[in-house]
A protein has these predicted regions:
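Active-site palm subdomain of RNA-directed nucleic acid polymerases
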Residues: 1-26
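Short, well-ordered alpha-helical packing segments
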Residues: 3-7, 23, 39-46, 118, ...
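Secondary-structure transition/capping motifs at alpha-helix termini
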Residues: 9-14, 31, 52, 180
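Short hydrophobic "helix-edge" motifs at membrane interfaces and signal-peptide entry regions
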Residues: 9-11, 85-88, 93, 184
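Non-catalytic, peripheral interaction segments enriched in hydrophobic/basic residues
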Residues: 18-19, 50-70, 95-227
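Catalytic palm subdomain of template-directed nucleic-acid polymerases
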Residues: 23-50, 105
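Short, conserved micro-motifs composed of acidic
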Residues: 40, 55-91
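Short linear motifs embedded in intrinsically disordered, charge-biased segments
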Residues: 161-321
C-alpha cells in the first residue's frame, strides 16, 4: 500500500512492482531521447522518495538496454544518473528469479538454470543408493522440476541449442534415478516414471496460459495477449463449438522478435494442438478428450500430461512447436 502511488510521479515511463522489486521501462530507438527522458524521470523519483521519507541504494540500481544484435547502442555516450551516481549499463539483470539479458535470448538464464539442474543431478546421484525410487521422484520434483518449470513459458522461447542443454540434463537425471546406462534410450523411462520431457513441459505451460485466457483467469494485462478468431473473423454457427476457442494468429514483422514472441508462439501451438477440438491420450479415438469437456485446470493439465506421455510411444521426436 505504501508505494501504490509511485506511478503518479512518472509521466513518460512505465513501472511495475513486486514486493520490494521495482522497475521503470521506456521505449525509444534514439539514445539521446532515452538519456533525456530517463534522467528527467529519475529526478521525479528522487522527489517522490524524499516526500515519502524513503531511500534507494543507487549501488543496487541497475540499468539495461534491450536491443537486437543488429542495432547496438553506444553505451559510453549515454549518461544516466541517479542521485549524482552514474548508472552503468549491464548485460543482464535478475528480476523475480529470472535472468533477463539485453538481447532477450535467455542465454544467461539457461546457463544459470543448467548449473542448478547439475547440482540437483549431483544430489540424486548420491541419494539413489540410500533411498527408494519414490523418494528420488519426490526429490526430483523438489529440486529439479521446480527450477525447470519456473518461467519456462518465457525462457522456453530460447534457441534450440539452449533447449538441448536442458534436455540433456533432464535425460541424465532420469538415467540417474533408474540406474540406466548413460547412453540408454529414455522414452520408456519417461513413461515408467510418469515424467514429461522438457519440451513438453514448456508446451504444457504455454497451453495452460491460453487455457487460463479462455477461462478469463488471467490478470487484465495478460488478457490482452491473445484474441479469439471469432472476434476477428466471421465464423459459421455450425463451427462455433470448435472455432470459438481457436486463437487469432497475429501478423509478425520479424523472425526473431515476432515468431519467437509468446503471443505468436502460444496461439500457434494452441491452434495446432486443438485443430480437431480433441486431445488423443492413448491412441484410441473413442477415448479422445474433447476440448469443450475439459472443465477444470487440474483436468486440463492431467489430460495434457497423458497426451504427451502417449506421444513417446509413437514418435520419440514428436515435438509441438
Amino acid at each position: 500500500m505504501y508505494i501504490n502511488d509511485f506511478y503518479l510521479c512518472l509521466s513518460q515511463t512505465r513501472c511495475g512492482h513486486f514486493a520490494d522489486d521495482t522497475f521503470i521501462i521506456y521505449n525509444s530507438k534514439k539514445a539521446k531521447t532515452i538519456e533525456t527522458v530517463i534522467n528527467t524521470e529519475l529526478k521525479e523519483v528522487i522527489k517522490w522518495l524524499r516526500l515519502n521519507k524513503l531511500s534507494l541504494n543507487a549501488g543496487k540500481t541497475e540499468l539495461i538496454f534491450f536491443h537486437s544484435k543488429k542495432h547496438s547502442i553506444d553505451y559510453e555516450k549515454v549518461y544516466i544518473y541517479f542521485n549524482g551516481v552514474r548508472l552503468n549499463p549491464v548485460d543482464h539483470i535478475k528480476y523475480l528469479g529470472m535472468y533477463i539479458d539485453k538481447f532477450l535470448n535467455w542465454n544467461q538464464h539457461v546457463n544459470n538454470l543448467s548449473k542448478q539442474l547439475s547440482r540437483a543431478n549431483g544430489v540424486l546421484s548420491k541419494l539413489r543408493y540410500n533411498a527408494s525410487l519414490d523418494i528420488c521422484l519426490q526429490v526430483y520434483y523438489a529440486i529439479f522440476f521446480s527450477y525447470l518449470i519456473y518461467g519456462c513459458n518465457l525462457w522456453g522461447l530460447t534457441t534450440e541449442e539452449n533447449i538441448c542443454k536442458i534436455e540433456i540434463l533432464q535425460k541424465k537425471c532420469i538415467r540417474i534415478m533408474t540406474f540406466a546406462p548413460f547412453n540408454s534410450h529414455t522414452n520408456d523411462l519417461f513413461i515408467e516414471l510418469g515424467i514429461i520431457k522438457v519440451r513438453d513441459i514448456i508446451s504444457m505451460t504455454q497451453l495452460s496460459l491460453v487455457y487460463d485466457f479462455l477461462n478469463e483467469c488471467l490478470p487484465s494485462d495478460l488478457m490482452r495477449l491473445f484474441t479469439l478468431s471469432s472476434n476477428v473473423h466471421t465464423v459459421p454457427r455450425e463451427l462455433n463449438s470448435t472455432v470459438n476457442r481457436h486463437l487469432y494468429i497475429p501478423k509478425v514483422n520479424t523472425t526473431k522478435y515476432g515468431l519467437d514472441s509468446i503471443r505468436y508462439h502460444c496461439a500457434t501451438l494452441w491452434n495446432k494442438m486443438f485443430k480437431t477440438g480433441a486431445v488423443n491420450i492413448d491412441g484410441d479415438e473413442k477415448n479422445n478428450v474433447h476440448l469443450t469437456k475439459i472443465k477444470t485446470k487440474k483436468h486440463f493439465n492431467k489430460t495434457m500430461k497423458k497426451h504427451f506421455l502417449y506421444s513417446y510411444t509413437i514418435d520419440p521426436y514428436l515435438v509441438y512447436y
